[in-house]
């Protein structure tokens, strides 16, 4: 993910080499940029790529640098932005859509507004700013100043005002840093450690540990010689530092580490103790996969990739191309990409088997890469011919469903729980372990979970996000409770590190996770999804379908076949709406008829408003399902949009997607009232054309009470169903599985509202 910073490299070897054979060609496009395009990064929230051209339009570097902006949807140049002199690095805050560029010779940082690609501010920092990192939670940017005088420091930039608010002194010749947003700590690598000025015989390097709450250095850790790159695994709380000189205190005076065995130091973030492992000759770059708990190091002299197991610190070696430079990993597919500088290729490696599955021809001298896991694209910067190669990623794994009797995995409420998640922080939960503890079944083979997520805010909750443990927090929300109500929302969430999921709460809130099934690789007992045009199967209003349900009394429904649900269905995809005549319902529980009522909730309503929630419900004997309102009478609406059954004609599999925002009407006006069409396939999320159904999280932001919102397939008649309700006028979310036939869907709002659609997966053959 990060190479050795270019200001440290004295010589870039440009040697002729034979191109390796290509096993599978996945080059999609080649985009021209400008001179010395050493670094690039993508904003996963907007699907825009930013390429840093250190020398701008002048190959002799006598002008300002530039940033080339590439539209990731069509792979064309959208803009070229002038920045300062000798720019070194850029970082993106996807939450604010701002890009920060360090200008080494100007001692400044250029701030680019990603909405209009203009420099909105230039911030003075310390001497020779280089590497930087951003904390998207606190909206602070940390800049390494490694020059003399004002150097040997970190500048802290407030992303709200884009002003430098603090300068923190660190060790000698700081070269890189990494932020842990979970613990609000910053780790700074000091190349020369405690020795002022570097020489051929220098002291070991150090890492300065900064507390982001008060900008103070709270610890200093000694690492190896010539440390350059640092990564933080915020799941295991381990920090990894690449030492280019390894255990050798006498690197060549020009910093040449060609024939020196590099090492990696693992720091325990709690105790600040260290362990060190050997890698290979001529370290070039390092990357981290927190989901797989693995660290990757390219070794440019012996043309290998070292793979470190974060648990055991065992090292495996993979042969790659000639003079490997950057290494990147797609944590969503566990695929590794290595830039082979002299071979003009990229090695594609399966992270599970460490087998090279493809070698792809790219441009001349590929030196840097970036993975956008949201759209499964890889971008490669070729400095030999000033281009960017766009590669497609490895296809996601097809998954099928295994229903589970609804079961409570987690409840943070005291006395049995660990207490609420503090506002502005996240926690990671190991669901397979929780499932064993709670007797919810064996989840060891689960790749993704079908959950019902309930929030119990202490006051109000701006938003909550749930995502795979070890992955970066996506710029989406799972649910909101701006009115402070207890709310539930269904979610299909892939498992991350050891099957874990992470949960972020913008404000302090308790969280409840109930499971009703999981998705895994196809097998003898797994089920495919069969889509249906949304259809209403139960409406108890006006004394229909048994009339109003009574508090504390179970009501059973046999799922009829008139909506296309066959007797072979083993689970149903419902949207359930509760309409209590007066007072709060407290909660409603839905489960397979014939089994004991589980201690779970399917939806919550403690104020008496109309509430909808999606639910995947296993089928009971004779296709019967049980419904239980806890504390009040209620009418029910039950809509079905699909079912799960053994494999057959028309059956679809789930393909999980790193959450991606398909549309946010707040960006283009006042929202809508009535019907609109959303072109999902042509959105920035780059979804495939064969998707048979989309898994959305739909959110409305109404200015006043909203009776209902309905989503349905484009090209079909609007069904008599609803997706969600916001009768109280507050922000409301609900999961929705919407069938697809032509890449678009329709949305109907009964009154004016803004709408946000985030996608977390799709069903396809």
Label for each model-derived stretch:
Residues 5, 54, 60, 191, ...:
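The N-terminal extracellular segments of secreted preproproteins, especially immediately downstream
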Residues 5-6, 101, 107, 143, ...:
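Sequence-pattern detector for short linear motifs
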Residues 1, 48, 261, 283-286, ...:
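Detector for methionine-enriched segments
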Residues 11-396:
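Predominantly soluble domains enriched in secretory-pathway, periplasmic, or organellar proteins
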Residues 1-9:
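Bacterial N-terminal signal peptides that target proteins for export
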């Amino acid at each position: 993910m990060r190479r050795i910073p270019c200001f440290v490299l004295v010589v870039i070897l440009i040697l002729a080499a034979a191109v390796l054979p290509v096993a599978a060609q996945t080059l999609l496009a080649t985009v021209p940029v400008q001179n010395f395009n050493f670094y690039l990064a993508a904003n996963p929230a907007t699907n825009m790529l930013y390429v840093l051209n250190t020398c701008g339009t002048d190959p002799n570097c006598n002008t300002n640098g530039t940033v080339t902006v590439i539209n990731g949807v069509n792979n064309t140049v959208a803009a070229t932005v002038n920045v300062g002199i000798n720019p070194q690095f850029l970082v993106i805050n996807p939450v604010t859509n701002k890009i920060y560029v360090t200008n080494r010779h100007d001692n400044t940082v250029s701030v680019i507004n990603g909405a209009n690609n203009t420099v909105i501010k230039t911030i003075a920092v310390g001497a020779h700013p280089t590497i930087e990192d951003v904390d998207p939670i606190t909206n602070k940017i940390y800049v390494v100043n490694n020059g003399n005088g004002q150097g040997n420091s970190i500048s802290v930039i407030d992303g709200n005002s884009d002003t430098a608010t603090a300068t923190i002194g660190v060790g000698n010749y700081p070269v890189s840093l990494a932020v842990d947003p979970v613990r609000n700590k910053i780790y700074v690598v000091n190349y020369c450690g405690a020795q002022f000025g570097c020489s051929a015989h220098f002291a070991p390097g150090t890492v300065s540990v900064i507390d982001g709450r008060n900008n103070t250095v709270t610890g200093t850790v000694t690492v190896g010689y010539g440390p350059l790159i640092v990564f933080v695994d915020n799941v295991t709380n381990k920090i990894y530092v690449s030492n280019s000189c390894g255990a050798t205190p006498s690197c060549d005076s020009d910093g040449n580490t060609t024939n020196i065995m590099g090492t990696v130091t693992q720091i325990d973030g709690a105790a600040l103790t260290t362990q060190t492992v050997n890698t290979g000759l001529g370290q070039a770059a390092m990357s981290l996969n927190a989901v797989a708990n693995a660290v990757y190091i390219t070794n440019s002299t012996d043309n290998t990739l070292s793979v470190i197991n974060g648990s055991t610190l065992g090292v495996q070696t993979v042969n790659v191309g000639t003079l490997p430079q950057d290494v990147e990993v797609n944590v969503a597919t566990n695929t590794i990409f290595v830039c082979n500088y002299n071979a003009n290729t990229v090695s594609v490696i399966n992270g599970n088997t460490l087998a090279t599955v493809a070698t792809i021809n790219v441009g001349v001298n590929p030196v840097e890469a970036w993975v956008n896991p949201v759209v499964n694209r890889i971008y490669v910067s070729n400095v030999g011919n000033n281009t960017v190669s766009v590669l497609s990623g490895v296809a996601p794994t097809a998954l099928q469903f295994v229903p589970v009797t609804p079961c409570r995995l987690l409840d943070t409420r005291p006395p049995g729980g660990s207490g609420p998640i503090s506002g502005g922080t996240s926690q990671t939960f190991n669901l397979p372990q929780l499932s064993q503890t709670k007797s919810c079944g064996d989840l060891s083979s689960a790749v993704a979970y079908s959950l019902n997520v309930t929030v119990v805010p202490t006051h109000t909750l701006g938003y909550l996000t749930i995502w795979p443990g070890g992955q970066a927090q996506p710029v989406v929300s799972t649910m909101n409770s701006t009115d402070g109500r207890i709310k539930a929302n269904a979610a299909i969430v892939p498992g991350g590190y050891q099957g874990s999921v992470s949960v972020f709460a913008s404000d302090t809130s308790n969280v409840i996770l109930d499971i009703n099934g999981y998705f895994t690789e196809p097998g003898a007992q797994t089920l495919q999804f069969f889509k249906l045009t949304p259809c209403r199967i139960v409406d108890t209003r006006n004394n229909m379908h048994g009339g109003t349900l009574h508090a504390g009394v179970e009501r059973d429904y046999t799922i009829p076949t008139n909506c296309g649900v066959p007797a072979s269905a083993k689970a149903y995809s419902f949207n359930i709406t509760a309409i209590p005549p007066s007072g709060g319902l407290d909660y409603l529980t839905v489960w397979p008829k014939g089994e004991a009522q589980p201690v779970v909730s399917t939806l919550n309503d403690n104020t008496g408003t109309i509430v909808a929630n999606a639910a995947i419900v296993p089928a009971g004997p004779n296709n019967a399902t049980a419904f239980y309102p806890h504390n009040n009478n209620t009418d029910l609406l039950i809509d079905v949009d699909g079912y799960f059954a053994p494999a057959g004609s028309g059956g679809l599999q789930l393909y999980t997607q790193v959450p991606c925002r398909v549309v946010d009407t707040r960006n283009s006006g006042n929202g809508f009232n009535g019907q609109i069409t959303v072109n999902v396939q042509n959105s920035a999320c780059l979804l495939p054309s064969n998707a048979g159904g989309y898994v959305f999280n739909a959110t409305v932001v109404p200015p006043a009470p909203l009776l209902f919102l309905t989503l349905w397939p484009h090209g079909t008649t609007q069904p008599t169903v609803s997706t969600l309700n916001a009768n109280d006028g507050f922000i409301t979310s609900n999961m929705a599985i919407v069938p697809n036939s032509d890449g678009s869907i329709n949305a109907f709002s009964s009154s004016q509202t803004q709408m946000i659609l985030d996608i977390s997966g799709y069903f396809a053959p």
